[in-house]
Amino acid sequence: MYLLGHIIGWLWLMLTVAIGLSRHSVKSANRFLILSRIGYLLIIITGVALAIRTLSGNWWLTLLKVILGLGTIGLIEVAFARKQESHLNSGLVTLLVCGTLLTIICGIGLHWQLTGNLI
């Protein structure tokens, strides 16, 4: 149940961030920033519940996933702040995409190692 909520939260976050950062209007981007923060809440709540359950199985990969997840959320906040100032550059977007992909790969790896199932 927590895993499904966590995945839905990440999908919601990726959707709102992609749409929000592609908006030309700052006001429109701010709406998606607020919507993305709803995703943060879901991700953090389900992430804590999942981390408690996976910490005994693989503590170092769980810790890495937590650090990558929080770092990705931080990069999203920085990207939206730069968008509001009209200073969003491609380097930051590339870093955000790479951070998100690393977080997803780490999460899939953690799930695979603990359950033996890829998905």
Curated annotation (Swiss-Prot):
Record bears the keyword Cell membrane: yes
Membrane-spanning segments: 1-21, 32-52, 60-80, 92-112
Coiled coil: none
Cystine pairings recorded for this chain: none
Keywords: Cell membrane, Membrane, Transmembrane, Transmembrane helix
GO cellular component: plasma membrane
Keyword Transmembrane helix: yes
InterPro entries in alphabetical order: UPF0344 (IPR010899)
One Pfam family it belongs to: DUF1516
Location(s) in or outside the cell: Cell membrane
Membrane-topology descriptor: Multi-pass membrane protein
Family note: Belongs to the UPF0344 family.
NCBIfam families: PRK13673.1-6
HAMAP family: UPF0344 (MF_01536)
Protein's name in the database: UPF0344 protein lp_1373
Record organism: Lactiplantibacillus plantarum (strain ATCC BAA-793 / NCIMB 8826 / WCFS1) (Lactobacillus plantarum)
Organism taxonomic ancestry: Bacteria, Bacillati, Bacillota, Bacilli, Lactobacillales
